[in-house]
Regions:
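A beta-strand edge to alpha-helix "cap/lid" segment located at domain peripheries
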Residues: 16-70, 75-165
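Sec-dependent N-terminal signal peptides
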Residues: 1-15
């Protein structure tokens, strides 16, 4: 049944959006680069992870609490700047925080697989407005995912806000 879901996810992803991704699989000790435009059985899971990362960006715009409850594992840890918070704080910030996200998308994502654990790195670009007016932010992110009970959940995330130039 998982193969059907994966096939549907891959079929709905536009070829031009896949081109911005790079996937890395880890069959042994050293990761091997995999061409994301021609997914193999080995990197199908990487494609699922990239889709989940894109769901995260869309969820920010929609303030989608249900999505984040599914994605964030119990015990999830998030750090940025000078704070580290847990799952409940992140859910609250996304749903009721002061910022309104009008656009959010990922760029240059890479997946590094280690069995049932994966690390996804990339850029998250967010535009919107908040109490101080309009904003355009670019974050460098590192997300750690674990596959449990036939699904991927994020267990840890770190975002670094790149200072405006």
């Amino acid at each position: 049944m998982d193969w059907l879901l994966v096939a549907l996810l891959l079929a709905t992803q536009a070829p031009d959006s896949r081109a911005k991704y790079s996937a890395m699989a880890t069959p042994g000790a050293e990761p091997t680069a995999v061409d994301a435009q021609a997914p193999s059985v080995q990197d199908t899971e990487a494609q699922v992870l990239l889709r989940l990362e894109d769901d995260w960006a869309l969820g920010l715009r929609r303030r989608d609490a249900a999505l984040f409850r599914r994605l964030l594992a119990d015990g999830f840890v998030y750090s940025e700047d000078d704070r580290t918070v847990g799952r409940d704080d992140v859910l609250r910030d996304i749903v009721t925080g002061p910022d309104t996200v009008e656009e959010a998308h990922n760029e240059e994502m890479k997946v590094h697989r280690f069995g049932t654990t994966a690390i996804v790195t990339g850029w998250l670009v967010v535009r919107g407005h908040g109490p101080k007016g309009p904003f355009s932010r670019r974050y460098r992110f590192t997300d750690t995912w674990v596959r449990r009970n036939q699904r991927w959940q994020i267990v840890g995330a770190h975002d670094y806000l790149v200072p405006a130039r």
